[in-house]
Swiss-Prot record:
Zn(2+) binds at C12, C15, C34, C37. It comes from Orientia tsutsugamushi (strain Boryong) (Rickettsia tsutsugamushi). The gene is clpX. Keywords: ATP-binding, Chaperone, Metal-binding, Nucleotide-binding, Zinc. It holds the Pfam family zf-C4_ClpX. GO terms for cellular component: HslUV protease complex. Residues 1-53 form the ClpX-type ZB domain. This is ATP-dependent Clp protease ATP-binding subunit ClpX. Coiled coil: none annotated. Component of the ClpX-ClpP complex. Forms a hexameric ring that, in the presence of ATP, binds to fourteen ClpP subunits assembled into a disk-like structure with a central cavity, resembling the structure of eukaryotic proteasomes. NCBIfam families: clpX, PRK05342.1.
Length: 417
């Protein structure tokens, strides 16, 4: 503990607080430091240690562990989870053995699947598993440089913001670009007219996806032209692109079907093959015909197709993941002393509604909100009550059944001396 010198109050050399304003003041050779500054330094060192530990330790996760972690949150996409687990493991190896970075190329991923099948959730889950910064962008808002819209460099800015402007961490992050199918060029053949939101964006993304030193404006692209740029190397960033690619199944069917005429022709029904079976025959040429340029596809060596969710998959999504929707609502009711019960038939009815609306898993929450809205409004008055949801309530928009909770009988234990 520092003492007064010549009856003058001593102060911290860092925060300038005097010894009367802090609990302890420790003297050094030529200065003083207070207990508050020491705690702050310890906190900063610990945060830095955790950051470095996260970057170095995630490489030890084998593909099987990554696969299991994805399946704990994402339902019905086992094949896609396996493909992504291997791709991320390769990234981890590149980080652990830097000398292999030039020898082993990174595995950027293209996710193809219908809306609401879990593309975005898989990318978010991956970032959490390996504890790296994550940023998401919408391809529809991107335009070629010099036109009204968002520059591709702004995607990297979002990742930098997610990493608290720690460039080292940002350079090892994951970027997910959604709606990538919306930047397909308008025709299969190159056009004379400029396609600034289609092929132009694909061309702009080529360099940052392959790996380059990008100049990122810390305050956003065009509103602050005089700002200093931050240099970020995108070589080790993992890019995951996702899209529904509506209509690509027709391109695949046109390629795979052998058209014959006459009495020996095989007549196929449109329902002979479902969406998932058709996507299993996907080839790079099909994506080129859809509108992705070959150079852009070359930067996405790993292609994973996600299955269309059926009724059972949607029921599983409601109940099985760690953060399942039913578990979330049951916890909210529990906090107010109420009990929420879903009958099995009610869960099936919710899944059927989502299938009818063709919104996939994304539509489940909206349906639950509609079913539980009035009950949630009165939740604070439902202490010690049971709220039961049946199939009839879901189908006909009826009010939930509310009745007193069953009291558990307490069993008295005989105490022997």
């Amino acid at each position: 503990m520092a003492k007064k010198i010549d009856n003058k109050a001593l102060s911290c050399s860092f925060c300038c607080k005097n010894q009367n304003e802090v609990k302890k003041l420790i003297a050094g050779f030529s200065g003083f430091i207070c207990d508050e500054c020491i705690e702050l330094c310890i906190h900063l060192i610990e945060e830095e240690r955790k950051s470095n530990l996260a970057i170095s330790n995630y490489s030890k996760l084998p593909p099987k562990k990554i696969y299991e972690a994805i399946n704990a949150h994402v339902v019905g996409q086992q094949q896609a989870a396996k493909i992504l687990a291997v791709a991320v493991y390769i990234q981890c190896i590149r980080f652990e053995h830097r000398e292999l970075a030039d020898l082993v190329a990174k595995s950027n991923v293209l996710l193809i699947g219908p809306t609401g099948c879990g593309k975005t959730l898989i990318a978010q889950t991956l970032a959490k598993i390996i504890n790296v910064p994550f940023a998401m962008a919408d391809a529809t808002s991107l335009t070629e440089a010099g036109y009204v819209g968002e520059d591709v460099e702004n995607i990297i800015l979002r990742l930098l913001q997610a990493a608290d402007f720690n460039v080292e961490r940002a350079q090892k992050g994951i970027i997910y670009i959604d709606e990538i199918d919306k930047i397909a060029r308008k025709s299969e053949n190159p056009s004379i007219t400029r396609d600034v939101s289609g092929e132009g964006v694909q061309q702009a993304l080529l360099k940052i996806m392959e790996g380059t030193i990008a100049l990122v404006p810390p305050q956003g692209g065009r509103k602050h032209p005089q700002q200093d740029f931050i240099q970020i190397d995108t070589t080790n960033m993992l890019f995951i692109c996702g899209g529904a690619f509506t209509g690509i199944e027709k391109i695949i069917e046109a390629r795979t079907s052998q058209s014959t005429i006459g009495f020996e022709a095989t007549v196929k029904s449109k329902h002979d093959q479902d969406y998932n079976q058709i996507l299993n025959n996907l080839e790079a040429d099909d994506l080129t015909k859809f509108g992705l340029i070959p150079e852009f596809l070359g930067r996405l060596p790993v292609i994973a197709t996600l299955s269309d969710l059926n009724q059972q998959s949607l029921v599983d999504i409601l109940t099985k993941p760690k953060n399942a929707l039913v578990k979330q609502y049951q916890k909210l009711f529990e906090l107010d002393g109420a009990e929420l019960i879903f009958e099995e038939e009610a869960l099936i009815a919710i899944a059927q509604k989502a299938l009818a609306k063709k919104t996939g898993a994304r539509g489940l929450r909206a349906i639950l909100e509609c079913v539980l809205l009035d009950t949630m409004f009165e939740l604070s008055n439902l202490k010690n009550m049971q709220v039961i949801i049946t199939a009839d309530i879901v189908k006909n928009n009826l009010k939930p059944i509310i009745k007193p909770k069953l009291q558990k009988k307490s069993v008295k234990k005989k105490v022997t001396a």
